[in-house]
């Protein structure tokens, strides 16, 4: 693990008020790992080819975690985390800095690009705070790859707060 802790994106996402239950996940992983006599966790360690070769593994599993994809959309990279265009990391940093209190969200238009788990988490934050939310995805269904429980709660949230959904839709440009 190249970071000083395990848990990956879940430790960051757990800063969202509706996701605080995830804060215990890294502790759970550590407790499980501690019971396994044949598992070693190296923190603050980059998984280089030379480092992996030192272990002489029979099997290698690439479990590199989740990093938000920044697709090659005109104007996107230039505007990320500058102003009103955020990755999930920028959005959570703004939440933690107090930039999105409930009164600031009322009536704001929020467009989420990507209907996967992270996009659904963003909607779950803004919709109950009175934002006018829209979610778009290139797939034919929002939350298409989500588990059944997430799909059920997503549908409930989207219906309750009037979240607009656009499927088979791709963002072309950010201005």
PLM-predicted stretches and their roles:
Residues 114-116:
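Glycine-rich Rossmann-fold phosphate-binding loop(s) that bind the pyrophosphate
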Residues 119-120:
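N-terminal Rossmann-fold NAD(P) dinucleotide-binding loop
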Residues 2-3, 139:
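Residues in the short beta-alpha loop(s) of Rossmann-like NAD(P)-binding domains
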Residues 14-19:
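Short glycine-enriched, charge-decorated loop/helix-capping segments at active-site entrances
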Residues 23-69, 83-108, 128-175:
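A Rossmann-like FAD-binding core segment of flavoenzymes
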Residues 123-124:
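Generic hydrophobic/aromatic pocket-lining and core-packing "Φ" positions
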Residues 6-10, 70-71:
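Short acidic/His/Gly/Ser-rich catalytic and metal-binding motifs that mark active-site loops
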């Amino acid at each position: 693990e190249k970071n000083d802790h395990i848990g990956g994106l879940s430790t960051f996402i757990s800063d969202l008020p509706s996701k605080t239950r995830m804060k215990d996940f890294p502790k759970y992983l550590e407790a499980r790992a501690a019971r396994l006599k044949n598992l070693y966790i190296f923190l603050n360690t980059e998984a280089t080819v030379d480092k992996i070769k030192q272990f002489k593994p029979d099997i290698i599993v690439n479990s590199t975690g989740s990093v938000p994809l920044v697709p090659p959309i005109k104007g996107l990279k230039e505007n990320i985390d500058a102003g009103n265009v955020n990755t999930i990391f920028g959005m959570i940093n703004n939440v933690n800095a107090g930039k999105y209190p409930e009164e600031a969200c009322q009536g704001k238009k929020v467009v989420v690009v990507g209907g996967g788990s992270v996009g659904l988490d963003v909607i779950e934050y803004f919709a109950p705070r009175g934002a006018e939310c829209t979610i778009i995805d290139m797939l034919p269904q929002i939350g298409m790859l989500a588990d059944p429980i997430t799909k059920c709660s997503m549908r409930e949230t989207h219906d309750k707060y009037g979240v607009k959904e656009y499927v088979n839709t791709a963002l072309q440009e950010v201005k």
